[in-house]
């Protein structure tokens, strides 16, 4: 019986020590910022609240390595010389940031994650996601620029006048919303999931082994390599396909084929 109680107490002590590894601290930001940049395996949550401190939830080791500062009007959240020794470390680095009403630039690198809960309203919004990172955001703006590369993943809801998207290096973008004008460059086995995004005027370049799905009134689509573009078009489609690429289209649109070379295919779905 004594041995049983000793083992039980040891187990409880182990659980308590494990629970005590994660601590919460507050960081009071003294400077104004309109951008957020995340570097490293950190989860940053932009919350609905508009004021208050930045809250960090992490292990003691991560707290010691975590650096939060405002530089060039950007809130930078990074890990300084941090060596991941435990699998749980990356799951316990969480930073909660209030929405100060001025945010319009979001950069996430090196396995970082940004989750933006409130809808962001700004004149221009810039989004960059690289090196196996992720972002989830809803924006209303005049101009939106999205750059996703290096096996990264983004989920974006955008209502804007114009949008410019660059996807490279096996990246993925799930896009919903609408724009008056859109320019899309999809390269290197990347994927655009935009069948629920409507564009009045669309320019789409798709190359490598990339895939793109999108809707537009007027569309200018160019595919090369082994890429595939699926376009729903209601007015005018200008299509150029080369290599082993494919353009599939649907909708009541006039079709102008400017190039259909190699083993490429342009056909109605």
List where the protein language model places each region:
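Intrinsically disordered, low-complexity terminal regions
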Residues: 1-269
């Amino acid at each position: 019986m004594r041995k049983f109680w000793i083992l039980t107490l040891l187990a409880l002590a182990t659980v308590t020590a494990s629970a005590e590894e994660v601590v919460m601290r507050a960081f009071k930001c003294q400077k104004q910022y309109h951008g957020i940049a995340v570097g490293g395996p950190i989860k940053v949550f932009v919350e609905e609240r508009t004021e208050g401190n930045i809250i960090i939830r992490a292990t003691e080791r991560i707290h010691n390595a975590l650096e939060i500062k405002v530089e060039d009007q950007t809130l930078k959240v990074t890990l300084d010389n941090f060596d991941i020794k435990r699998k749980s470390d990356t799951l316990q680095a969480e930073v909660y940031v209030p929405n100060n009403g001025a945010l319009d630039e979001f950069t996430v690198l090196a396995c970082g994650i940004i989750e933006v809960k409130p809808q962001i309203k700004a004149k221009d919004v810039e989004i960059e996601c690289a090196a196996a990172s992720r972002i989830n955001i809803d924006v209303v703006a005049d101009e939106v620029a999205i750059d996703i590369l290096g096996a990264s993943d983004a989920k974006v809801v955008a209502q804007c006048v114009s949008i410019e998207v660059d996807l490279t290096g096996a990246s993925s973008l799930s896009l919903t919303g609408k724009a008056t004008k859109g320019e899309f460059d999809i390269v290197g086995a990347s994927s655009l999931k935009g069948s629920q995004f409507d564009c009045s005027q669309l320019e789409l370049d798709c190359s490598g082994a990339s895939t793109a799905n999108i809707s537009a009134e007027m569309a200018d689509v160019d595919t090369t390599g082994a890429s595939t573009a699926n376009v729903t078009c209601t007015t005018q489609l200008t299509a150029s396909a080369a290599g082993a690429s494919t353009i599939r289209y649907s909708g009541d649109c006039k079709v102008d084929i400017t190039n259909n070379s190699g083993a490429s295919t342009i056909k109605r779905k």
